[in-house]
Amino acid sequence: MKSNNVVFARIFAVSWLVLFCEIMVVRWLGMEVRVLKAFPNLIVIIALVSTSAGLLVPSGKEGGNKRDLVQGLIAFLVLISSVLFSGPLHLADSSIKADHPAPEVALSAVALLMLSACLYVLFKILGKLLAAEFDKLKPIVAYSSNLLGSIAGALSFMIISELCVPPYIWLALVGAVLWFLYKKSYVIAVTVVCVAMSAFVYSGAYFTPYSKITVKPAPAEILAVNDQNSFALYSNNLYFNGGLNVDKVDHINEIQNDSVEVKGMKAYFGVLRVPIMFQPMHDDVLILGSGPGNDVAYALKGGAKHVDAVEIDPVIVKVGKEKHPNNPLTDPRTTVFTEDARSFLRYSKKLYDLVEFAYLDPGNTIDSASLVRVDNFVYTVESIKSVLNHLKPNGVATLIFTTPSVDSFIYQRLYKTVEAACGKPPIAYTARGGVTIVIMFGPGAHPASPDIMASADLVSYPPPGMVLNEPAMTDDWPFLYLALNPLGLITYALLLFVSVVVPVLLMVFSKADVKISKPDWGVMFFLGLGFMLMETKSITQLSLLYGATWLVSSVVILFVLVFAFMANMLASTRNFKSIGWIYLGLVLSLAFGYFWQMPTAGAEHPWLLAFVTSAIACLPVFFGSFIFSICFKNATSNIAYLSANLIGVAIGGLTENICMFSGIKSLAILALFIYGLAYVCWKIGQKNKPLVDVEKASVSS
């Protein structure tokens, strides 16, 4: 019989493993398997549902544990091999777009199903391992260990992400915890193989907090006419930028090569000089999304006295400082800020002659958009207004964006957003045959002269007769890339049915003795659903303050778990006969969060604003977790209650996508309704309990 301390430690370790692996596969698969960007929350939902399924099927015998371990290691090897060799397997460029060849779409669908199956096997085994230990402790103690392990998992990945640690370290940590749980030599063997493969495959890559960055020499044709130090940057296996000598960049137009890199450099560098052409008086320049420094080099070449370069990715800044032929980021006239563009605008007080929206999407999200819910708070009405507040009396702002088509819905959204922020139509052009849009606004913006239009190959936008039907983007609806592709919807629905709906139905209607009443199951389910909705809303609120970064998401997850742990500790101190007053606090905190408006400028002290915003965002989570802990304290079956809650969290991960249609603030209203259903289930359960107690008493007598 294991001591309580050993059981507590094992629950902690499994909980660490579940959350760490969940975050790890979300980030890693998103980098390597391109099509997964089109399916928001799919990995998280599969992980939660499979863990919940495992909780209801605890492994009893030691042989069963061995079989689980072998099956899990096989699934782990398949998953890791698919990720590491996504290039040769053509998973890196997979797509489910209707205009792609049918074999490619079929391959993508098969790959998604295979990866989903591997994830299901892995997380179900972790759920079984957790179930084997969970019922050995009192509910409140077991849940405390679960929360502490989850907190440690979130904190661990947050730290290694910020330190730009490569994946072989991730795998080594996972292998070490698995060995602690199983004490089997083949766990070490499989870990060593996976670590070695990862170290070999990623030997030349940088893992930033946001993406995988690879630096290669520019194509030979570029090197021949530009500079021998010119380079190409790849983000998540796709070319997205490069560093060229801007004094010789005109020569690349003579190259006939149609490679992705050459075409991309022609389109990108062809419009870089446009902002300077539109604002000849540009002593002070701000560049949002400065990348490796090309925009900065053009601004300095054009006579800028000082340039503030804002770039969120520290690795891209490092590459620019070390490798760019013009050395713009190390020029004494340049100040580099490694932070989110929206966060910089909030706290900066400086005014500029020229503000440039440069490359702000190094992940090439738009190239894989199908059913995409990507929050982008830089291209919103509120953000554009913030830029206007940073312009001098004759200042100009330019927004340059590249998409595959002149009639792209993205062009329309960007145009309508700037129009809504300025109160009048902006000056807009398309360039390079329609693949790039240039939007100018601000008090000093004026239409281009015919000479400038001819020199930069500009055409007025929108074309005559074109109707712009797309909505403007706001902080409540910041979905620049959202495109409801019918094929993507069908594929997503099929994946959800196979990976989520079927397992949930099997769990709900199984005849296993789960020792939980229907009202209690409903309480746990709806509390989990509401929890996920409020976690999503919290991430969004804090993204407006600090930027939509991995660090923000990790910090929110960490704080949510800490709040849940605090609520759990409070629930363990005494017996609460009624939770009505806690529901009242939950309702009030939801209402306050809905009506509270974050200040648009950084007049308040950053730490004070951070504390207030975090408290308002996470307070509903505290009350919801408090209710959960009180109910869980009296659970008749730890694993049954936790399983129901995880199913609710998983379905919440799907339900949160309603905000694509109704806005992010609507999640608070939806959460209020969901928590109301939890309260109704609790009241029904309270009415039924006296009847159950009477029946038990009569049987015993």
Regions picked out by a protein language model, each given a short descriptive name:
Residues 1-701:
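Alpha-helical transmembrane segments of multi-pass membrane proteins
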